[in-house]
Amino acid sequence: MTDPIPSAGETTIIGLPAIQIPITTTGDRPLTQEDIETIARLAPGTALLISTRGAVSGSRYLLDEDEVTVGRDSRADILLYDSTVSRSHAVFRRVGDTFVVYDSGSLNGTYVNRQRVDHQQLRNGDEIMIGKFRLVFFTKSAVIA
């Protein structure tokens, strides 16, 4: 029912086969049936961010434009109002059939899977941390086998 999270390799460091973990959680909480249905209805070329931490936990943000801005400024497409978020913090850009997150020179940085990045192509289940907010990235392929 769900696609596995791609493994780093075919075997573990101790020689055991790598396991395939289906995407059924958003980091801090399991996906709800409503989350799964929303992801399954995504149009081609779009993606969904589900907030798992911060004042907007549980909120969903549709990435359906070529560029979606994130920040504390009221003009941001995704407004995350907190002092840990820069006014212009990050940008999600559609590049072909994928999305890439770019840090906009923010003070506290943008993190993907707990690694600070200047830019990073996103995959299903990636966790993006902007300030104290955590957003998990999904495309339709996350729930469609």
Give the role of each language-model region:
Residues 1-80, 143-145:
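Intrinsically disordered, low-complexity acidic Ser/Thr-rich regulatory segments
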Residues 135-143:
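Short, Lys/Arg- and Gly-enriched loop/turn segments at beta-strand edges
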Residues 57-134:
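Forkhead-associated
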Residues 51-53, 94, 139:
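Residue-level signal for short segments within beta-strands and strand-turn junctions
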